């Protein structure tokens, strides 16, 4: 099954409770606007739990918010879970556990059994042309209500480009890097 990361966006109502809510809403999509703890809990339940099913959130693009119980992991049916998302290799999220420690030549800490070991068996980073992605976002985001095309362009540069650079910095943490073809290369 595919476990989409978008369901772990912090709901808009919770973002509006942040101390600087206008900034949090504007930067939605940045690492701190996702619920990494909920993702970690669900990965723990899937990987190390014994529940026959685990309900997982999705993202309702029509509402612009996560939707609880949108996906179901069934232990009896799903032998492979592909977890996809932007910040899964983000070092502050601690989702790679021993995988990254082994890659970096570090030894497991003796007696530390709570280090998220085993969330991912293998990680793949799909690298895309940054400029092409930024331009696609500018076009896609023009449907966001309340923003002019110029405001969308500014937001993409200030928010989405920064987020993309954050993602790119985690590329070396993956076991495999695959280069995505641009439109001109795939024709």
Predicted regions and their residues:
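Conserved catalytic segments around the Walker B and adjacent sensor/switch elements
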Residues: 1-4
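Receiver (REC) domain switch/active-site residues of two-component response regulators
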Residues: 6, 121, 175
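Conserved RecA-like P-loop NTPase ATPase core
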Residues: 6, 39, 82, 124, ...
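Conserved nucleotide-sensing/catalytic segment adjacent to the nucleotide-binding pocket
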Residues: 9-63
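Alpha-helical scaffold elements adjacent to nucleotide-binding pockets in ATP/GTP-utilizing enzyme cores
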Residues: 38, 42, 133-140, 155
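Short gly/ser/thr-rich secondary-structure transition/capping motifs
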Residues: 58-68, 83-86, 156-161
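ATP-dependent NMP and nucleoside kinases share a basic, alpha-helical "lid"
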Residues: 66-140
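Small-molecule kinase domains that catalyze NTP-dependent phosphoryl transfer to phosphate-bearing small molecules
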Residues: 110-115, 139, 143-187
């Amino acid at each position: 099954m595919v476990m989409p990361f978008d369901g772990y966006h912090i709901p808009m109502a919770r973002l509006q409770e942040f101390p600087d809510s206008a900034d949090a809403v504007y930067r939605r999509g940045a690492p701190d606007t996702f619920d990494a703890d909920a993702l970690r809990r669900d990965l723990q339940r899937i990987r190390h739990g014994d529940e026959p099913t685990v309900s997982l959130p999705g993202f309702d693009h029509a509402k612009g918010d996560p939707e609880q119980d949108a996906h179901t992991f069934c232990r009896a049916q799903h032998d492979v879970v592909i977890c996809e998302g932007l910040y899964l290799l983000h070092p502050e999220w601690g989702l790679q556990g021993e995988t990254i420690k082994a890659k970096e030549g570090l030894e497991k800490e003796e007696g530390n059994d709570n280090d998220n070991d085993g969330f991912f068996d293998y990680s793949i980073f799909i690298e895309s042309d940054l400029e092409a992605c930024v331009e696609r976002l500018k076009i896609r985001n023009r449907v966001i209500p309340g923003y002019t095309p110029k405001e969308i362009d500014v937001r993409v540069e200030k928010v989405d480009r920064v987020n993309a650079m954050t993602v790119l910095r985690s590329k070396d943490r993956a076991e495999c890097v695959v280069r995505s073809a641009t439109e001109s290369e795939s024709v």
